[in-house]
Amino acid sequence: MNKVSLLHEGKAKKVFLTDNSDLVIQEFKDDATAFNAKKKGSIQNKGVVNNAISCTLFTFLGENGIPTHYVEQLSDRDMLCKHLDIIKVEVVVRNVAAGSLVRRYGFKEGFVLETPIIELYLKDDDLDDPLMNESHAVALGLASYEELDRLKELAAAINTLLRSFFADRKLNLVDFKLEFGRHNGTILLGDEISPDTCRFWDLDSGEKMDKDRFRFDMGGVEDAYSEVQRRVLEL
């Protein structure tokens, strides 16, 4: 499968059209951004690590009944995917209070939520990806109420699967972001699942093992990403 032309370049990936109109190639970059690209940098080998993690997790989810855009891993940085009509709604699932949840509502960081919180955000960098509800999404023409119910249903199922998967690897899935798209009338999970899109804390030590290490200049970013990769791929 060959890259024909660049369809889109985002903060962490390039998406290429292929000679099959139904398929695209995602190329993972080493570029790193935080705070909606207000902070920029690079994490050595990040693209390779995130591609390997994402391919493994998409395979796992697909084997457990979650429809995804993943087709196959083409190389250390390239993933073959189904061509989606992206729904401009980011779905965030929170199991433990961290990040903006702490800032907005006054939770203590690390507070374990009795029930996971599912949030919707408008996918728009210029507006800083604002929090929104279903009525906003429908009014903006992004999705129907039925589609939004499906997004939340899938997000909850994915959370159940991934929490167990990561707990087996001594990682606490604190929260994570999902993106979805339409493909031939079906909603599929898209984008990636990696330390760029998830908060991971070591279950024993509580050490942060995700992009927060880049956001807040904690150091050890490459080591944390590589350790997550090692644990994801080890079993």
Curated annotation (Swiss-Prot):
Pfam families: SAICAR_synt (PF01259). Gene3D superfamilies: ATP-grasp fold, B domain (3.30.470.20), Phosphorylase Kinase, domain 1 (3.30.200.20). The keyword Cell division does not apply. InterPro entries: SAICAR_synt/ADE2_N (IPR028923), SAICAR_synt_PurC (IPR033934), SAICAR_synth (IPR001636), SAICAR_synthetase (IPR050089), SAICAR_synthetase_CS (IPR018236). Its EC number is 6.3.2.6. Keywords: ATP-binding, Ligase, Nucleotide-binding, Purine biosynthesis. It comes from the Bacteria. Pathway: Purine metabolism; IMP biosynthesis via de novo pathway; 5-amino-1-(5-phospho-D-ribosyl)imidazole-4-carboxamide from 5-amino-1-(5-phospho-D-ribosyl)imidazole-4-carboxylate: step 1/2. GO terms for biological process: 'de novo' IMP biosynthetic process; cobalamin biosynthetic process. GO terms for molecular function: ATP binding; phosphoribosylaminoimidazolesuccinocarboxamide synthase activity. It catalyses: 5-amino-1-(5-phospho-D-ribosyl)imidazole-4-carboxylate + L-aspartate + ATP = (2S)-2-[5-amino-1-(5-phospho-beta-D-ribosyl)imidazole-4-carboxamido]succinate + ADP + phosphate + 2 H(+). SUPFAM superfamilies: SAICAR synthase-like (SSF56104). Belongs to the SAICAR synthetase family. This is Phosphoribosylaminoimidazole-succinocarboxamide synthase. It comes from Prosthecochloris aestuarii (strain DSM 271 / SK 413).
